[in-house]
Every structure is written in C-alpha cells, then in structure tokens.
Amino acid sequence: DRPFRAAFMSPMQDHPISVPLWRQLQGASSLLMAVRGGQSMTVALEKVEGVLRPGVQALAFHALRWLGRAEALRQQLAKRPPPPEADALLCVVLALIWQEKDAPYTPHTLVDQAVEAAKHSDATRHQASFINGCLRRFLRERDALVALTDRYPQAVWNHPQWWIDRLRKDHPDEWEDILRANNSRAPLILRVNARKTTRQQYLQALHETGLEAAPVGEHGVILASARPVPSLPGFDQGHFSVQDAAAQLAAPLLLDGLGAQLGRPLNILDACAAPGGKTAHLLELTDACVTALDIDARRCERIQQNLDRLGLDAQIRVADAAQPDTWWDGRSYDAILLDA
C-alpha cells in the first residue's frame, strides 16, 4: 500500500538504495525479537541508528501487522522453528512477500537481501541456506501455502487467538468489524506549529507540492496519503510535528485559559515527556517555563532534538517523576501533564 511504500527510498526497484535493504531487514528483525520479548516497539526504536530508523520502522510495523500470517506460513515451511534470530528474519520477509499486490520490493530482491541479512550476522550466518530455501519454496508454492494458512484465524486476522476469542465473546455481532478496523493503517496527522505558521498557510504549502490534506481539530492536518515525514514541506524549518488528533487535545485542555487567569507566564511540568510532542504543543500555545521530565536519557535526547527543530526551549531533565526529591526545585507548578 502507498503509506508503507512511501517509507522507502526506491520501492519496487532492484538498483541499490541509499541504505541497503539487508540492513533494514536486520533492524526490523531485531525489533520483532524485542517485541516478542515484551519490549515496547517505541523503546526498541530508540536504539536504531537514525539513518536506518524510517525504513526499519516501516518494515517492523508491517511485519507486526501481518505477523499472524507470516508465522503460519513459517510453520508450513519449517515444522521445527529455527533459532529466534532466524525465525524473526524469516517472518519479517514472509510478511513482506506473501502478497504480490503493492509489495515494496520485487520477490527476488527480498529473497536476495534476506540472505544477505542472514550472512551479515553471526546469529544467522549458518541459517542463510535455510532461509533461502524456505523463501524460494514459498515463491514456488505461494498460492497453495497461503490457502493452507487460511484455515487459521490467527493468519486471517493477524491477532492472537486469545484476543480473537475474547472479541467474539464480548462483541458477537461486531468482532469482525473490530478486527478489520484494528488492522487498518492509521492516517498521518500533523500538528502545525503556531509559532512558525498558520494551519491555512501550511495546507497551502502542502497543496503546492501536490499533497491533499484537510484540517482536523484545532491545529491538526490529516494527509490523504502518507509520505516520508522529512520530505514534507517545512520539516527542517519546524513548521509541524507528527501527532495523533487525540494527543493534540491534551495541551489545550490543560491550558484552557490558565495563562489569562494568572496573568503571567506559566510554570508547567510535563512528566514522562518523551518524545516531546505534548511539551512542544504547550510551548507553541503559550509563553511558559516547561520542565520536560523523563526517566530515559536516550528519550530525553529525542525531546531536545524535536524542540531544536521546532525552535522551542524547555528544561529537560532525566529523572523519575515519582521521586521529586531528586529533581524538583521546590517551585510550585501551575499545571502538570502526565501521560502514562
């Protein structure tokens, strides 16, 4: 589909791209292993090198979206599961390759790059031939193998069986619609930086580059089709941030005339602030001293990067909000935002 393909430099082409596909496949496989191990995808992404992050993120999310199908196909191709690293790589590629329609790369490119990914890792080097054999068998027997997996609800709905069973029990008339909606791709929604431009001006900038968009909420813009975020007009100039429409409600609700009521700049705490979307929104809407707090130092770096791009400034602190004695200066806050 277009949003997925847009994350890559050269979809459906076989010439070299700026970041080798095999490296992106390795990164996506590592993220899949992290999620299988109980880690948040958001946290795992923080460890991915910046130049790799857009492609790796797109591959990993795609793999998770089709993981039920990919795991069912892997079971048909190999009755005994391979080591975890090889299994993750195989599932990522099967998620990419099982549908021919709108695939981001041609089948032989994916197979070739999957083998390269396996060869370039000590954990999967000895599984390269196995991965190559599984994928080439799938290409030969695609229709039959997909039909075999259609009997498994996890493959059809790409949800765990316990989740499917629970939905069928709790929502007997709507469970299929719920699963379909849950499998749909979320739209790309931006928040316009009111310090830099107006929403109408930004909609015009999108229109001039051939992108269809519409207003949503008070400061939001929803794109008709997703694009790589750094390629959107005004990215480097800090004209917008990516933020869901629901998340854009937090800052206005918190402020709600508070500055006018007090008649002075506000002192605000954003606890658990990373990656900084709501911190930035607060600073865009009012003159305030905002303390952006997060327990993860790496994620605090992301807050700083985002604020720098937007031309905003906050007091960023690496600390545990639950232990104020370690970071609080004793000055009362006019408002506290906690999204946890």
What are these language model-derived features?
Residues 2-340:
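S-adenosylmethionine
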